[in-house]
UniProtKB/Swiss-Prot annotation:
Organism this protein belongs to: Desulfatibacillum aliphaticivorans
Reported function: Responsible for the release of ribosomes from messenger RNA at the termination of protein biosynthesis. May increase the efficiency of translation by recycling ribosomes from one round of translation to another.
Domain of life: Bacteria
Listed GO MF terms: ribosomal large subunit binding
An annotated GO cellular component: cytoplasm
UniProt xrefs under CDD domains: RRF
Example of a GO biological process term: translational termination
Predominant location: cytoplasm
Family: Belongs to the RRF family.
The protein, known as: Ribosome-recycling factor
Family annotation (InterPro entries): Ribosome_recyc_fac, Ribosome_recyc_fac_dom, RRF_sf
Record localization: Cytoplasm
Key words of the record: Cytoplasm, Protein biosynthesis
């Protein structure tokens, strides 16, 4: 019975880690990445549309992103969406292709990015701890209902804490790696 509680907690914590990793993909490291534009949507015939659904996005060089719209009439809309996105990118176009040169991060921008990573790390840990709380409440209610003995409930809570500690360490490791990428020159 407790195995189900552990398994559910692990699955939810895995999802929290996946959400953190997805969020960290959008944090700039000074190199071009397709995921940088994931959250950017353009107004495509009245519908908010991700850029990669209206154009071919490529990375020909480590510090350059090219965007070739399938419909040349939306080139200005794509540019506008990128400028509004608060990514600090300046697109330029030649009428057919948008080019985005990724500038090296300034020291101040690097510090901002590290702060953002730390904030995301804390949010990830909070998610994991909330899942721990839910699992512990499930165990307590099982004990209260008489489904498990008191000593088993304490062992269950210890196991949930071990699982939580493992996932908090994963969050720390993932964010430390991202921080290292940001601070690399």
């Amino acid at each position: 019975m407790l195995e189900l509680v552990y398994e559910e907690a692990r699955e939810k914590m895995d999802k929290a880690i996946a959400a953190l990793e997805k969020g960290l993909l959008r944090v700039r490291t000074g190199r071009a990445s397709l995921s940088m534009l994931d959250g950017v949507k353009l107004d495509y015939y009245g519908t908010p549309t991700p850029i990669n659904q209206a154009a071919t996005v490529a990375i020909p060089e480590s510090r350059l992103i090219t965007i070739q719209p399938w419909d040349a009439s939306v080139i200005k809309d794509i540019e506008k969406a990128i400028l509004k996105s608060d990514l600090g990118l300046n697109p330029s176009n030649d009428g057919k292709i948008i080019r985005i040169a990724i500038p090296p991060l300034t020291e101040d921008r690097r510090k901002e990015m590290v702060k953002l990573v730390n904030k995301m790390s804390e949010e990830g840990k909070i998610s994991v701890r909330n899942i721990r709380r839910d699992a512990n409440e499930t165990i307590k209610s099982m004990k209260k209902d008489g489904d498990i003995a008191e000593d088993l409930a304490f062992k269950g809570q210890d196991e949930v804490q071990k699982i939580t500690d493992d996932f908090v360490k994963k969050v720390d490791d993932i964010c430390a790696q991202k921080e290292k990428e940001i601070l690399e020159f």
